[in-house]
Amino acid sequence: MQDFFANCATVLQKYGFSYLRGAGTTLLLALVGTFFGCLIGFAVGALQTIPVDKQRDPVWKRVLLKILRIFLRCYVELFRGTPMIVQAVFIYYGLLQVFGIKMGMWQAGFFIVSINTGAYMAETVRGGIVSIDPGQTEGAKAIGMNHWQTMVHVILPQALRNIIPQIGNNFIINIKDTSVLSVISITDLFFVHKSVVGALYTYFESAAIVMVIYLTMTLFASYLLRLWEKALDGPQNYDLNTTDSLAYTSGMYNAPDPNHESQNLDMKGGAAHV
């Protein structure tokens, strides 16, 4: 056990900065990929839920939406049904060999994580939109909003709050799954681990260090996401005024405290007297 900690100290002394730089690369890939993946997911999810009226919509619109939905469905199933490491090899090496399309490592990395996350987020967003009470859409139409105004101002803000846990889950998954991008030579945390092992042959020690770093990043990300959820929930220490005694009986509201009310009246009376 002493040799283990001594070896870990030696590895950190020689390659500590490389581990930190690799962790920074991993976080950057996960953060940027999740952000653009969410944008893709919101766009795809919103497009998949465009309503079609067979009586009012012209034929060309119905045909166009049908083709669009088939294309989006193929995109979602393709990138959800294949491993990210295979996608990375196909996009970075395959496109260059077959079509002559050359992408830089960073461009390919961001692109791969974004479109992969977008495929998962598309279904999440679609489910979040469908879960919203249809009365919200009907009410928006009643005041003259069209479909896109309803989506932007009414539906999507509520859907966003409902799918925050899944956004956080995808971010944490991306922190771990970006390790596969070492196959295209991106110097993330796992790439650094392989380099250290190749130099020192400290498989167990280097793997332990990398696991601790990954665990620290995911736990910190989970904590920040919980804070974000609480911030969106707003304060929980207020009660709405109501004169319906049944609301107090059912537990929907807390009954006002008479002592607290009398103290408030005394304070107001004292202030008025002064």
Regions found by a protein language model. Give the residues of each.
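Transmembrane alpha-helices and adjacent helix-loop boundaries
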Residues: M1-V274
